[in-house]
Amino acid sequence: MSRIADNPVSIPKGVEVTLSGDNDIKVKGAKGSLAFAIHPLIQVVQDGETLRFSAKSTDKRVNALRGTTRALINNMVQGVSQGFERRLQLVGVGYRAQLQGRKLVLSLGYSHPVEFTAPEGLTIEVPSPTEIIVKGYDKQQVGQAAANIRRFRPPEPYKGKGVRYADEVVVRKEAKKK
């Protein structure tokens, strides 16, 4: 059983955490602000520069929910202070990306260019034509935007062509033999 909920979340300098009575938490920092509704069976206590989590029940599901809540709030604190980024690579002949304002234009071997508009709160950088960096303060939103870009052309197993995460390992298949 994981004991992740037993570890307190430390609040760095420059991050302001507000707990309201109706189980809402607001985290505000240099990069932005996030809000989260805490489950009624989970209690969050702020003592100084740390947040502690306790369950109002001894049920296994409530303990699991306590760990999930702790992880989500830790991601919120980390996001508003440092931010998150996800790197993508374009592998394939003629596969390239370019940025036009807030719009990412991808050439992925289709008969038409694929366009992706960055949601509010996210920034997209294209340091080279085959590299994309998605940055933001909401971890879930950064990961979802990167997954949406990857979904336009996921890596195929025979040649490895497609859009992949920078740290992704594509398991290759052998071609059919006659």
Swiss-Prot record:
Q: Name one GO molecular function term.
A: rRNA binding
Q: Which UniProt keywords apply?
A: Ribonucleoprotein, Ribosomal protein, RNA-binding, rRNA-binding
GO BP terms in the entry: cytoplasmic translation
Give the highest taxon in the source lineage: Bacteria
Q: Would I find Ribosomal protein among this entry's keywords?
A: yes
Membrane-spanning ranges: none
Q: Name one GO cellular component term.
A: cytosolic large ribosomal subunit
As for what it does, the entry says: This protein binds to the 23S rRNA, and is important in its secondary structure. It is located near the subunit interface in the base of the L7/L12 stalk, and near the tRNA binding site of the peptidyltransferase center.
**Subunit and partners:** Part of the 50S ribosomal subunit.
Homology family: Belongs to the universal ribosomal protein uL6 family.
**UniProt protein name:** Large ribosomal subunit protein uL6
Q: Which organism does this sequence originate in? A: Nitrosococcus oceani (strain ATCC 19707 / BCRC 17464 / JCM 30415 / NCIMB 11848 / C-107)
| Gene that this sequence comes from | rplF
